[in-house]
């Protein structure tokens, strides 16, 4: 008789955006319980071993973590399968490196290097705003945080700017038409654009129409949209392509141009 959760994860069942090779063994690291869903996170072992190449083996990753060299959102993490997720700040003080976990235009996690003031905050999407015991208002964020006494103007689907040292809300962005967003789910994951229109369907999910900087329009669900700035200016720096997805033909032309130039 099965008792509790599975403790293993087969490599073929691992999320595609982890980019694990098929011949690297039968198993993949199973993410621990944490602030992000198991299929929407990147375990620390994959960050250190597969992405940053600071370790060659599983044991080397454990040795690095046990020396307390890795911090996620300003807290030391020693769990090798700790689930880091979208917008998390991964810091390695020994090498003076800081990264923010974002999506590239192909929907895969990328470690985007950040510096200065950007390492001191993260953006959090508000899941719900409720009242607790004795009428105390609080909000829940997408990464499992509960923050009491928020600004009364903050509603569900808005984005808050959270100071990682004090864990206090510094500022917030309303989920409005005209603000810049990043898509965090579905086939358009990783694309960045400005909200053009909101379609409300009674008894069904809301559809959001987004236009990117290249003028391409696409639609996605409300739950897949994460506001990252006011107007067209994002509050966080973006990866190389700035969230603009190229079509297959545009990518082929770009490759040909690069080959001809070489």
UniProtKB/Swiss-Prot annotation:
Belongs to the eukaryotic ribosomal protein eS4 family. Its main location: cytoplasm. It is found in: Cytoplasm. PANTHER family: 30S/40S RIBOSOMAL PROTEIN S4 (PTHR11581), SMALL RIBOSOMAL SUBUNIT PROTEIN ES4 (PTHR11581:SF0). Keywords: Cytoplasm, Ribonucleoprotein, Ribosomal protein, RNA-binding, rRNA-binding. One of its GO terms (cellular component) is cytosolic small ribosomal subunit. The keyword Zinc-finger does not apply. The keyword Nucleotide-binding does not apply. Gene3D superfamilies: 2.30.30.30, 2.40.50.740, RNA-binding S4 domain (3.10.290.10). Residues 42-104 form the S4 RNA-binding domain. It holds the Pfam family KOW. This is Small ribosomal subunit protein eS4. One of its GO terms (biological process) is translation. GO terms for molecular function: mRNA binding; RNA binding; rRNA binding; structural constituent of ribosome; translation initiation factor binding. PROSITE patterns: RIBOSOMAL_S4E, S4.
